[in-house]
Amino acid sequence: DCLPDWFHYEGHCYRVFDEPKKWADAEKFC
């Protein structure tokens, strides 16, 4: 199960952020 406002995809939880980020930046941000 994912936290509220997060969605489940292929065994992982994701969240959409208002500000665009590159994958590398997103990984560091998480």
UniProtKB/Swiss-Prot annotation:
Biotech use, in short, is:
Used for quantification of normal prothrombin (CA-1 method).
Disulfide bond recorded as keyword: yes
Q: What is its main location?
A: secreted
Query: What is the residue range of the signal peptide feature?
Result: none
What keywords were assigned to this record?
A: Blood coagulation cascade activating toxin, Calcium, Cell adhesion impairing toxin, Disulfide bond, Hemostasis impairing toxin, Prothrombin activator, Secreted, Toxin
Q: Which family does it belong to?
A: Belongs to the snaclec family.
Q: What is this protein called?
A: Snaclec carinactivase-1 regulatory subunit 14 kDa chain
Q: Which organism is it from?
A: Echis carinatus (Saw-scaled viper)
What lineage does UniProt assign to this protein's organism? Eukaryota, Metazoa, Chordata, Craniata, Vertebrata
